[in-house]
């Protein structure tokens, strides 16, 4: 036989517990659990999302600062400094990009480690 979730208290201890804040809360909680637990929990979730929206707004404000409308003078300067683009030239440049300056290098193994030949 067990007491379950109830803690054994003497009669005097039980009266003192019921007079305390925790005891009164437990009494109300047993009568209306949603009102005393569910509703505060849901309200904390909703209010927390409103309070945290300020932090998420900073993220979008930073992205908006990066993307700004350009003035005509800046656009003309950017076009003047732009490299000439030819699709065939880019294709041939990218074809030979990875093969020029690398060589396979064997990484040393730890002592006792197998070679794992496939």
Curated annotation (Swiss-Prot):
Compartments in which it is found: Mitochondrion inner membrane
Recorded topology in the membrane: Single-pass membrane protein
GO biological process, one term: mitochondrial cytochrome c oxidase assembly
Bilayer-crossing regions: 33-53
Keyword flag Transit peptide: yes
An example Gene Ontology CC term for this record: mitochondrial inner membrane
Record keywords, A-Z: Membrane, Mitochondrion, Mitochondrion inner membrane, Transit peptide, Transmembrane, Transmembrane helix
Matching InterPro entries: Cyt_c_Oxase_assmbl_COX16
Pfam families: COX16
Chief localization: mitochondrion
Keyword Nucleus belongs to the record: no
Record-stated family: Belongs to the COX16 family.
Function: Required for the assembly of the mitochondrial respiratory chain complex IV (CIV), also known as cytochrome c oxidase. May participate in merging the COX1 and COX2 assembly lines.
The protein's name: Cytochrome c oxidase assembly protein COX16, mitochondrial
Species the sequence originates in: Kluyveromyces lactis (strain ATCC 8585 / CBS 2359 / DSM 70799 / NBRC 1267 / NRRL Y-1140 / WM37)
């Amino acid at each position: 036989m067990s007491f379950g979730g109830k803690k054994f208290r003497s009669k005097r201890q039980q009266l003192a517990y019921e007079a305390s804040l925790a005891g009164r809360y437990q009494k109300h909680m047993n009568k209306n659990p949603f009102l005393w637990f569910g509703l505060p929990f849901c309200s904390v979730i909703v209010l927390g999302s409103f309070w945290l929206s300020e932090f998420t707004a900073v993220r979008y404000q930073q992205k908006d600062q990066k993307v700004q409308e350009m003035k005509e003078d800046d656009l003309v300067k950017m076009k003047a400094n732009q490299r000439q683009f030819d699709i065939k030239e880019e294709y041939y440049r990218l074809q030979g990009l990875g093969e020029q300056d690398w060589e396979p290098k064997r990484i040393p193994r730890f002592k006792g480690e197998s070679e794992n030949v496939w």
